[in-house]
């Protein structure tokens, strides 16, 4: 995800070379003499399908907000300084494509395109078709390796040297590409199916989880709550008593019921509701259409990319704020004195101590990185286009007054 190329066109050239080398090299040197004519024709038809899916992943636009887009009540009013337009929920400005992208997942250097609302199905189909094709090639090359092993006692002149050299070269190359694609596909599908998130939203959730115990995060959330609901944030209570038991310091001298605490003591990061997770089936259908359309080139998302269906848990969400709840920015805090005492109780609770000492606690959204070292910049987000100082919530009172 963090790959950035000096010449972006190389990002398309490299996959084309690898696909052509594996697909046609395997056919010319190995399959031509080991598969029937029908099998070879079907194989080449499938290779054409892979090329078509890759072409669509490159050329299909991910989608951009309409001109003069107006956010609804309860949504973030986020202005793009470069597009001179408001951004819908889940949208970001891509620094490479130089435009706002609907439901931006990431900018993919290997397709020279953003993966977003409209072309995510094409991207997933390309990766899926590539995995199936690579699996078949690996299977056939593996059969040849077994054949060479069984023929190891035969005279060497009975073995096709060109074919053997091709197998020795193509097998590790194909395996390397296969493993790389599998990792990417599994990561995308886990986030899409089981969490309903884009790669950027997963990063945002990790950021909020990392800074969940900090006052600067909760000062901003309290400010946002008052802006949207017109009242102070109530006392928050966790739905997961087991998680709360382990996350809250048992030896804390603070009263958990004290609402004057800036950071809620009875609330955990698991209690933050991600509004767009509708369940495995609905997540896949909304992103890629019904199952019988998943492998077809015209299968696409069922939503418009401007407004998204929220899950039923939003009715029980104690914060009642749009995603992300801090709006992507937080209240500034005074510099923390590095020379502080650590109590015995803190030494006994190492996870809490590590969170407290994590240097990412006081990082801004543009600086923060996850455990893999990824920042928003690595996903292609143009932070210079964001007008954080003027981002605001659209309250119901504003809509009614207008």
Curated annotation (Swiss-Prot):
It comes from Debaryomyces hansenii (strain ATCC 36239 / CBS 767 / BCRC 21394 / JCM 1990 / NBRC 0083 / IGC 2968) (Yeast). Keywords: Acyltransferase, Endoplasmic reticulum, Lipoprotein, Membrane, Palmitate, Transferase, Transmembrane, Transmembrane helix. Mediates the reversible addition of palmitate to target proteins, thereby regulating their membrane association and biological function. The gene is PFA4. The lineage of its organism: Eukaryota, Fungi, Dikarya, Ascomycota, Saccharomycotina. InterPro entries: Palmitoyltrfase_DHHC, PFA4, PFA4/ZDH16/20/ERF2-like. Pfam families: DHHC. It is found in: Endoplasmic reticulum membrane. Its EC number is 2.3.1.225. Its main location: endoplasmic reticulum. Signal peptide: none annotated. It comes from the Eukaryota. PANTHER family: PALMITOYLTRANSFERASE ZDHHC16. This is Palmitoyltransferase PFA4. One of its GO terms (cellular component) is endoplasmic reticulum membrane. Residues 30-39, 147-165 are lumenal. It is a multi-pass membrane protein. Residues 78-128 form the DHHC domain.
């Amino acid at each position: 995800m963090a790959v950035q190329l000096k010449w972006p066109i190389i990002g398309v050239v490299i996959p084309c070379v690898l696909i052509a080398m594996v697909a046609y090299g395997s056919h010319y040197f190995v399959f031509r003499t080991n598969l029937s004519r029908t099998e070879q024709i079907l194989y080449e038809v499938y290779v054409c399908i892979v090329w078509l899916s890759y072409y669509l992943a490159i050329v299909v636009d991910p989608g951009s907000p309409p001109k003069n887009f107006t956010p609804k009540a309860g949504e973030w009013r986020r202005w793009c300084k470069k597009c001179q337009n408001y951004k819908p929920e889940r949208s970001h400005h891509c620094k490479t494509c130089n435009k706002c992208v609907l439901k931006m997942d990431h900018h993919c250097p290997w397709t020279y395109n953003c993966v977003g609302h409209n072309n995510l199905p094409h991207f997933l189909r390309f990766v899926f078709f590539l995995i199936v094709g690579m699996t078949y090639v690996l299977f056939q090359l593996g059969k040849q390796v077994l054949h060479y092993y069984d023929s190891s006692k035969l005279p060497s002149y009975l073995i096709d040297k060109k074919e053997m050299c091709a197998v020795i070269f193509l097998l590790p190359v194909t395996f390397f590409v296969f493993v790389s694609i599998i990792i990417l596909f599994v990561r995308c599908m886990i986030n899409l199916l089981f969490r309903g998130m884009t790669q950027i939203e997963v990063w945002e959730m990790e950021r909020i989880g990392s800074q969940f115990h900090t006052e600067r995060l909760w000062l901003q959330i309290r400010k946002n709550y008052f802006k949207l609901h017109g009242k102070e944030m109530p006392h928050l209570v966790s739905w997961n008593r087991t998680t709360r038991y382990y996350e809250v310091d048992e030896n804390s001298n603070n009263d958990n019921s004290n609402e004057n605490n800036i950071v809620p003591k009875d609330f955990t990061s698991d209690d933050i509701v991600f509004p767009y997770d509708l369940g495995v089936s609905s997540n896949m259908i909304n992103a890629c259409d019904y199952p019988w359309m998943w492998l077809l080139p015209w299968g696409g998302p069922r939503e418009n990319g401007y407004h998204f269906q929220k899950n039923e848990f939003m009715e029980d969400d104690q914060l009642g704020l749009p995603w992300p709840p801090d709006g992507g920015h937080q209240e500034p805090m005074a510099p923390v004195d590095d020379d502080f005492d650590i109590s015995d109780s803190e030494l006994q609770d190492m996870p809490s101590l590590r969170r407290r000492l994590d240097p990412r606690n006081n990082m801004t959204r543009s600086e923060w990185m996850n455990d893999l070292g990824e920042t928003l910049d690595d996903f292609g987000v143009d932070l210079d286009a964001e007008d954080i100082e003027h981002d605001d919530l659209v309250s119901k009172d504003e809509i009614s007054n207008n």
